[in-house]
Amino acid sequence: MAMVRAHVELDERELNDQVRTFERRRMASLQRRIANQARADVPVDTGHLGQSIGEGQIRFTGPRTVEGSVHALAKYAAPVHEGSRPHLIRPRNAQALRFQIGGRTVFAKLVRHPGTKARPFLRNAGLRIASRER
């Protein structure tokens, strides 16, 4: 009967360094693909919301754990993504609101906004890219 014995020692520090390089590249690739998918999915009016989509920093939160993010920095990104409840719009610096309806100028002291439906372009992009990874 033949027998082989082996003794293997892992250099944890070296392993972590090599894994970090791989993880950083992998996270950067995921962030880039999610951001591109979100830009393709974003509702377009002026294009500012799509232009505000970017990738956050990559951070290592543990020995072999990496974290990254994709964000939209436009002021109105959260209400578009999450939706909004019905609410009142009142003038801040004047006595009335002024806006156009059908080419006519309208003045109002108060507007009852009906709210907006959520359009979660970032979440949907993340889920779509993640589903391709499995």
Where are each of the predicted segments found?
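Short, Lys/Arg-rich flexible segments
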Residues: 1-134
